[in-house]
UniProtKB/Swiss-Prot annotation:
PANTHER family: PQQA PEPTIDE CYCLASE, RADICAL SAM DOMAIN PROTEIN. It comes from Xanthomonas oryzae pv. oryzae (strain PXO99A). NCBIfam families: PQQ_syn_pqqE, rSAM_more_4Fe4S. This is PqqA peptide cyclase. Binds 1 [4Fe-4S] cluster. The cluster is coordinated with 3 cysteines and an exchangeable S-adenosyl-L-methionine. Belongs to the radical SAM superfamily. PqqE family. Residues 4-220 form the Radical SAM core domain. Catalyzes the cross-linking of a glutamate residue and a tyrosine residue in the PqqA protein as part of the biosynthesis of pyrroloquinoline quinone (PQQ).
C-alpha cells in the first residue's frame, strides 16, 4: 500500500440535473439519473473521509447543486469538519430561502456562471429563457448576505468580443473575482466544438482585453484567465497533476482524478459505496495510472517541464490522438500538434453550425420536479 500527499480539494458533483442546457457543458455524454445519485449519508461520509485525509476545500457542484434539498445539511457538515465550502451554481434554481439556509449552514463562497452579457446570447448558449436577469438577481442576493462572489464567464466564438462587458458586469454585481475562461472541449462541449471554436484573432483580442482590465483595475477585481488549448504551444497540467491535488466525486459516487476522466475507455473507477476514499486515492487503478512521471512516453521523460505540466491532459490526449497515454497533442513536441492547430483554424474559419443541445427542444425554464 502506498500513500500519496492528500488532495487539496474535493469536488462533489451532487447531481447531473440542471435547468440549463449549455452547449459547452463539460459533463459526460451519459448523465446520472436522479435514482442513481448518492444519498445524503453517502455524501456525509465522503466529507468525513476527505477531512480525515487532510483535504481543505469542498466544492459543491453539479449539474445544479441547489436542486439537492440536502445541500444545506451537507454544507453544514463540511463546516463542522473544518472544510472550506464553495458553491458552484447557475443561479437560476435557488432563491433567497435556499441561500439563507446555506448561509446559516456556513457557506463561505459562491461561484456563479454567466454565459454572456447579451441577454439573447446568454439564453441561446444556455438553452434557457431569461437567464441573465435571474442571475443578476441571484448575485444581488448573494452580495446582500455578505458572501464572497466569483463570476465564471465562459468564452467562445459567439461572445469573445464581449470580455470588457463581462468584466464590467462583475464589477456591477460586486464580485471579488472573475474567471474568464475559454471553452475547454470535454463531454458535451466536444460535440459543439465546431460551433464554439474562436479564431486566433478573437483569442488575441480576449488576451488584450484581460491585460487592459488588469492594468486599469488593479486590485479592484481579481481576474483569472484561461486560454483555449487548441491554440497553445504548451499543455496545461491536468488539475495540477493527475491524482495530485484534486479529486472529483460523480453523482453516483465514482471517484475520479478529473472531471472528464470517464471518457477514458477501459479505465476502472472505484466507487465510494465499495471502497474508502483514502484507499482509492492512494492505490486506485485510475489514480495510480497517470500519477507522477513514470508513465510518460520518451518525449515527455526528457522534457524539463515534465513536473510542471505533468504531460498535459490525459482526456484531451485521448480525444485528439486516440491514446490517453501519449503526449497531450497541444504540446508543440507532439507529432499531432500541427493537426490540432489546423483543426482549430479550420473550424473557426467555417460558418458556425447550430448548437446541439442535450434537450433538442431548447427547454423552457425548468423546475426541480422536471429534471429527473
Amino acid at each position: 500500500m502506498t500513500t500519496a500527499p492528500p488532495p487539496l480539494s474535493v469536488l462533489l458533483e451532487l447531481t447531473h440535473r440542471c435547468p440549463l442546457a449549455c452547449a459547452y457543458c463539460s459533463n459526460p455524454i451519459a448523465l446520472a439519473a436522479l435514482r442513481e445519485e448518492m444519498d445524503t449519508a453517502g455524501w456525509r461520509s465522503l466529507l468525513e473521509q476527505a477531512a480525515e485525509m487532510g483535504v481543505l476545500q469542498a466544492h459543491f457542484s453539479g449539474g445544479e447543486p441547489m436542486l439537492r434539498k440536502d445541500l444545506p445539511e451537507l454544507v453544514a457538515h463540511a463546516r463542522a469538519l473544518g472544510l472550506y465550502s464553495n458553491l458552484i451554481t447557475s443561479g437560476v434554481a435557488g432563491g433567497e430561502p435556499m441561500l439563507d439556509q446555506l448561509q446559516a449552514a456556513g457557506l463561505e463562497h459562491v461561484q456563479l456562471s454567466v454565459q454572456d452579457v447579451d441577454p439573447a446570447g446568454a439564453d441561446r448558449i444556455a438553452g434557457y429563457r431569461n437567464s441573465l436577469p435571474k442571475k443578476r438577481d441571484f448575485a444581488a442576493t448573494v452580495r446582500a448576505r455578505g458572501l464572497p462572489l466569483t463570476i465564471n464567464a465562459v468564452l467562445h466564438r459567439h461572445n469573445a468580443e464581449r470580455v470588457p462587458g463581462m468584466i464590467a458586469l462583475a464589477l456591477e454585481w460586486q464580485a471579488e473575482r472573475i474567471e474568464v475562461a475559454h471553452t475547454q472541449y470535454y463531454g458535451w462541449g466536444l460535440r459543439n466544438r465546431a460551433a464554439l471554436m474562436p479564431s486566433r484573432e478573437q483569442l488575441m483580442a480576449t488576451i488584450e482585453a484581460v491585460d487592459t482590465a488588469r492594468r486599469e483595475l488593479g486590485d479592484r477585481l481579481a481576474i483569472d484567465f484561461v486560454t483555449p488549448d487548441y491554440y497553445a504551444r504548451q499543455p496545461k497540467p491536468c488539475m495540477g497533476g493527475w491524482g495530485q491535488r484534486f479529486v472529483n466525486i460523480s453523482p453516483r459516487g465514482d471517484v475520479l482524478p478529473c472531471h472528464a476522466a470517464e471518457t477514458i475507455e477501459g479505465m476502472r473507477f472505484d466507487n465510494l459505496r465499495e471502497r474508502a476514499l483514502a484507499d482509492i486515492w492512494n492505490n486506485g487503478e485510475a489514480f495510480v495510472r497517470f500519477r507522477g512521471t513514470a508513465w510518460m512516453p520518451e518525449l515527455c521523460q526528457g522534457c524539463p517541464k515534465r513536473e510542471i505540466d505533468w504531460g498535459g491532459c490525459r482526456c484531451q490526449a485521448l480525444a485528439l490522438s486516440g491514446n490517453a497515454a501519449t503526449l497531450d497533442p497541444v504540446c508543440e513536441r507532439s507529432p499531432a500538434h500541427a493537426q490540432v492547430r489546423a483543426t482549430a483554424e479550420r473550424e473557426a474559419a467555417a460558418p458556425a453550425p447550430e448548437f446541439i443541445y442535450r434537450r433538442p427542444e431548447r427547454p423552457a425554464p425548468a423546475t426541480a420536479d422536471t429534471l429527473e
